[in-house]
């Protein structure tokens, strides 16, 4: 059977946008957007009419209709508390498991966005996560969470590698050190601010291997208790559903 090599090659190098893979190509995304008003984050702009209070197009609107938890103009949340900049930028961990009871009133995001996942509590406490690379949450290294050292930023820290703060290597701008840099804030080099009242540097305290192993055991026990609670919750749901069907089935026979 003859094969048109030119036709096959043209299909492989085709620039058709519909052939490109992407998260917005999932079949369940239209259902999420139409039924619940949330879905995957895209570059679609927010609907101006919806932001002002009402959009006549409803779910058929081509623009985004963010949930109330993502609207930053409100002064209070559903719980009556002041809005949190952290809550409005993190994905709800219960939503990912299908167990969020707050629904549209949840203070966290109900969407699938790996870049907005909350920080893994297990990894943040001991640097260990039993899920490893399969964990859906962010693994932030302890060194990245440390504040920068003011002494090091000004040129020298007497504690060196023992300092409890982060030493970020930056190249000082020679023009700024001399007195004036024509690039100003757009300069690619560092422009340190010289402060007269710097806090004294402190020595970093490292945990022993026994302390780390104890924290890992506590994390494993906590995760096992959480799995047990989820199993009990699902079993109760299942028993309740079968009970309802059993009652209706019994009435029909009588």
From Swiss-Prot:
Zinc finger annotations (C3H1-type) as residue ranges: 42-68, 91-113, 114-142, 143-167, 168-194
A molecular-function term among this protein's GO annotations: zinc ion binding
Residue stretches of biased makeup (Basic and acidic residues): 207-239
Low complexity bias spans: 68-84
Subcellular compartments: Nucleus
Keyword DNA-binding among record annotations: no
BP GO terms, sorted: mRNA processing
Disordered: annotated segments: 65-84, 207-254
Pfam families per UniProt: zf-CCCH, zf-CCCH_2
Cellular component terms per the entry's GO annotation: cytosol; mRNA cleavage and polyadenylation specificity factor complex
Keywords, sorted A to Z: Metal-binding, mRNA processing, Nucleus, Repeat, RNA-binding, Zinc, Zinc-finger
InterPro entries: CPSF4/Yth1 (IPR045348), Znf_CCCH (IPR000571), Znf_CCCH_sf (IPR036855)
Domain of life of the source: Eukaryota
The keyword Zinc-finger is assigned to this record: yes
Family of this protein: Belongs to the CPSF4/YTH1 family.
Described purpose of this protein according to its UniProt entry: Component of the cleavage factor I (CF I) involved in pre-mRNA 3'-end processing.
The protein's name in its UniProt record: mRNA 3'-end-processing protein yth1
């Amino acid at each position: 059977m003859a094969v048109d090599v030119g036709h096959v090659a043209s299909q492989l190098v085709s620039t058709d946008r519909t052939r490109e893979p992407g998260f917005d190509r999932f079949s369940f995304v239209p259902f999420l957007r139409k039924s619940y008003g949330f879905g995957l984050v895209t570059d679609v702009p927010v609907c101006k009419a919806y932001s002002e209070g009402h959009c006549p197009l409803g779910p058929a609107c081509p623009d985004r209709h963010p949930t109330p938890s993502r609207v930053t103009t409100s002064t209070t949340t559903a719980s009556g508390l002041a809005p949190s900049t952290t809550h409005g930028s993190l994905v709800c961990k219960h939503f990912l498991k299908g167990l969020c009871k707050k629904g549209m009133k949840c203070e966290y995001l109900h969407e699938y966005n790996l870049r907005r996942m909350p920080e893994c509590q297990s990894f943040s406490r001991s640097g260990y996560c039993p899920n490893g690379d399969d964990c859906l949450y962010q693994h932030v290294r302890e060194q990245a969470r440390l504040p920068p050292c003011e002494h090091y930023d000004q040129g020298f820290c007497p504690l060196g590698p023992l300092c409890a703060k982060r030493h970020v290597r930056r190249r000082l701008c020679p023009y700024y050190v001399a007195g004036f840099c024509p690039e100003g804030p757009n300069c690619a080099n560092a422009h340190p601010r010289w402060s007269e009242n710097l806090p004294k540097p402190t020595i970093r305290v490292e945990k022993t291997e026994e302390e780390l192993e104890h924290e890992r055991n506590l994390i494993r026990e906590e995760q096992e208790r959480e799995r047990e609670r989820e199993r009990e919750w699902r079993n109760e749901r299942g028993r309740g559903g079968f009970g309802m069907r059993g009652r209706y089935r019994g009435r029909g026979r009588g």
